[in-house]
């Protein structure tokens, strides 16, 4: 898998201006890899930012900035997008099949926190959807406090 490295600030700006298309572009080769890894019950490669996106500001890397969901509208667009919404639900369903493991066993500690943030964000956008099931199954129903604060502050 190739990871795009930003060589100039203009590169990052260009990708940010692409809207949710930036996720589709990133997933072109890596979605199948990510799904296969989750189906096997263990994340092994680097794709978390654009497969399970979270609210911008949670991470400090260029990838967490680039693939961070900027506001509620972008989160809604992501879920409503025919490709992205379908893929997020598909890989989330695959994750739920591993209810005999912890999120940390599947993702590792840091990425397990990112998934919790992602599920909290999308559960707030689409209550009653599959995302609450992940939070209940892997996180004892506990939501990401930072994400909830951002939503309450209307920054998402």
Set out the residue ranges of the language-model regions:
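Extreme N-terminal tail/first-helix region
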Residues: 2-29, 146
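A long, hydrophobic alpha-helical segment
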Residues: 27-39
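Hydrophobic/aromatic-rich, well-ordered segments within soluble, folded domains that form packed cores
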Residues: 37-70
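Residue-level detector of well-ordered alpha-helical segments, enriched
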Residues: 43-50, 87, 111-118, 130, ...
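Short helix-capping/linker segments at secondary-structure and domain boundaries
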Residues: 57-63, 123-133
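Chitinase-like catalytic core of GlcNAc-active glycosidases
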Residues: 62, 67-86
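Mid-chain, well-packed structural core segment of small domains
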Residues: 77-123
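Charged phosphate-binding loop/patch that engages nucleotide di/tri-phosphates or the phosphate backbone
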Residues: 127-156
């Amino acid at each position: 898998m190739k990871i795009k490295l930003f060589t100039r600030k203009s590169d990052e700006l260009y990708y940010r201006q692409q809207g949710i298309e930036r996720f589709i572009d990133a997933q072109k080769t890596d979605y199948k890899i990510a799904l296969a890894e989750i189906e096997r019950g263990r994340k092994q490669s680097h794709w978390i930012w654009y497969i399970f996106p979270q609210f911008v500001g949670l991470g400090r890397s260029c990838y967490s900035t680039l693939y961070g969901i900027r506001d509620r509208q972008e989160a809604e667009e992501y879920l409503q997008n025919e490709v992205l919404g379908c893929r997020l639900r598909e890989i989330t369903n695959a994750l739920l099949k591993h209810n005999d493991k912890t999120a940390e066993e599947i993702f590792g500690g840091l990425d397990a926190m990112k998934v919790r943030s992602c599920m909290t964000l999308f559960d707030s956008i689409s209550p009653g959807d599959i995302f609450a099931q992940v939070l209940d199954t892997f996180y004892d129903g506990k939501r990401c406090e930072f994400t909830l604060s951002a939503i309450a502050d209307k920054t998402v």
